[in-house]
Amino acid sequence: MTDVADVNVGIIRFPGTNCDRDIEYAVNLVGANSHYIYWNETDLSQMDVVIIPGGFSYGDYLRAGSIAGITPIIDAIKDFAKKENPVLGICNGAQILGEIDLVPGVFIENENAKFICKSKKLKVNTTRTPFTKLYKKNEVIDLPIAHKEGRYYTDNLETLYDNNQIVLTFEDGNPNGSLDNITGVCNVDGNVVAVMPHPERAVEKLLRSEDGLKFFKSFLD
């Protein structure tokens, strides 16, 4: 078990990020240290984990995550991931990870072209990532979603199954038209995870569900 007091989590902030404080709360709740890292910084050497929050980086102009994907911090995130360090992108963070090719596929506009905000039942398809290893395989969890561009698509679906890269799928109906109900994927190595649902909004029973807490406890295990 890692000494949580020694774990430093970098929370990336872009103009338009708005879920950073929720993630800070979740990280601190499990006892790790949270640090805000801004879009124009280039050093992640003191971090053990990087989390890219949700929000609307740069107003989601052009395409969700596209402008954030060319900022100075991106090369540092790529280098961090290349060393097999844990990287988690949530909602807009997941879109950014798709934009910079750290995970396969893309998250595009919902089939109904509307913003969807609701709680969903999700299946944990793999426990091999740093963020899901405390769950049971095929465990069903309750997490909120809140997005307009959350429909997952890839040309390489068979490869995802072959490599065990599907992290989360919708279990109680597909709200946005995602391919094969997919709402979370990882890279081949499993250290980079992109999920559209918000685990940081489900860390206490007061918030309806605490099913997201293991996302943050897992990287400490």
Curated annotation (Swiss-Prot):
It holds the Pfam family GATase_5. GO terms for biological process: 'de novo' IMP biosynthetic process. The keyword Cytoplasm applies. Its EC number is 6.3.5.3, 3.5.1.2. It catalyses: N(2)-formyl-N(1)-(5-phospho-beta-D-ribosyl)glycinamide + L-glutamine + ATP + H2O = 2-formamido-N(1)-(5-O-phospho-beta-D-ribosyl)acetamidine + L-glutamate + ADP + phosphate + H(+); L-glutamine + H2O = L-glutamate + NH4(+). Residues 8-221 form the Glutamine amidotransferase type-1 domain. Its main location: cytoplasm. One of its GO terms (cellular component) is cytoplasm. The active site is at C91, H198, E200. HAMAP family: PurQ. Part of the phosphoribosylformylglycinamidine synthase complex involved in the purines biosynthetic pathway. Catalyzes the ATP-dependent conversion of formylglycinamide ribonucleotide (FGAR) and glutamine to yield formylglycinamidine ribonucleotide (FGAM) and glutamate. The FGAM synthase complex is composed of three subunits. PurQ produces an ammonia molecule by converting glutamine to glutamate. PurL transfers the ammonia molecule to FGAR to form FGAM in an ATP-dependent manner. Part of the FGAM synthase complex composed of 1 PurL, 1 PurQ and 2 PurS subunits. This is Phosphoribosylformylglycinamidine synthase subunit PurQ. It comes from Methanosphaera stadtmanae (strain ATCC 43021 / DSM 3091 / JCM 11832 / MCB-3). The gene is purQ.
